[in-house]
UniProtKB/Swiss-Prot annotation:
Residues 150-231 form the PRC barrel domain. This is Ribosome maturation factor RimM. Keywords: Chaperone, Cytoplasm, Ribosome biogenesis, rRNA processing. It is found in: Cytoplasm. The gene is rimM. Binds ribosomal protein uS19. HAMAP family: Ribosome_mat_RimM (MF_00014). An accessory protein needed during the final step in the assembly of 30S ribosomal subunit, possibly for assembly of the head region. Essential for efficient processing of 16S rRNA. May be needed both before and after RbfA during the maturation of 16S rRNA. It has affinity for free ribosomal 30S subunits but not for 70S ribosomes. It comes from the Bacteria. The PRC barrel domain binds ribosomal protein uS19. It comes from Paraburkholderia phymatum (strain DSM 17167 / CIP 108236 / LMG 21445 / STM815). Its main location: cytoplasm.
Length: 231
């Protein structure tokens, strides 16, 4: 997430500038009963599969390991809590994908643990079940992201927007955002011609701060900036 200053989900907020218009364990043989119970739970967790995949699913992290012995998983979030990773802490249902396999599972509880997030998922009753989920990418619905403050934006909502300057000159589309530690930077791509006369993809980097970013119109899918085409 980025603040037009500040994360696949960051958010952004522009820093105000004076006069700026825009605000911005070991092997153990398990009892048959437990094995059957785990199988039933796993089947239930797969009940909601690709058919129920939400149209606004956003990838927010990946399951990298099991955590503890009680079925918790460890997730490497694509953004820190407070920068889009907080969606993993607030949403009650996750969608998981690995290769062509897709499934949905309730997130019973989650919390920050060091530089990762750990969570207890429905149908994942022990460490073996949690280990089986390693490598799955985690998605949540965009509509379930935490609400932002005024003039704050999730990066996922900015990618793909057209960028034009105040003179109406088209500068390209937002391809990505970069966090340089001090602020967010729009990485804009546009069609260009290389020195050999062949088509290439040009790049512009515009700091996402109020002195340059004047308007973010998500309805019109457009960002207006104070930036010249030859900068």
């Amino acid at each position: 997430m980025s603040e037009r200053d500040s994360g696949s989900s960051g958010r952004a907020k522009a820093k105000r500038q004076p006069g700026a218009k825009a605000p911005f364990g070991p092997f153990v043989r398990k009892p048959v009963e437990k094995v059957e119970a785990n199988a039933a739970a796993a089947q239930k967790a797969r009940a909601e599969s690709a058919e129920s995949w939400p149209d606004d699913a956003v990838e927010v992290g990946a399951i990298v390991d099991a955590y503890g012995l009680k079925g918790w998983v460890k997730v490497a979030a694509h953004a820190d809590a407070g920068h889009g990773g907080d969606a993993l802490l607030s949403t009650k249902r996750w969608w998981l994908e690995k290769g062509r396999e897709r499934q949905s599972t309730p997130c019973l509880q989650s919390k920050v643990h060091g530089d990762s997030i750990v969570a207890q998922l429905g149908g994942t009753a022990d460490r073996d079940a949690a280990l089986a989920l390693r490598g799955h990418r985690v998605y949540v619905r965009r509509r379930d992201f935490p609400a932002l403050g005024t003039d704050e934006y999730y990066w996922v909502d900015l990618v793909g927007l057209d960028v034009v300057n105040e003179a109406g000159i088209e500068l390209g589309k937002v391809a990505d955002l970069i966090d340089n530690g001090a602020q967010s930077v729009l990485r804009i791509e546009y069609p260009a011609i290389g020195k050999d006369g062949k088509p290439v993809i040009g790049e512009r980097l515009i700091p996402f701060v109020g002195v340059y970013v004047k308007t973010v119109d998500q309805a019109a899918k457009k960002i207006i900036v104070d930036w010249e085409a030859d900068y």
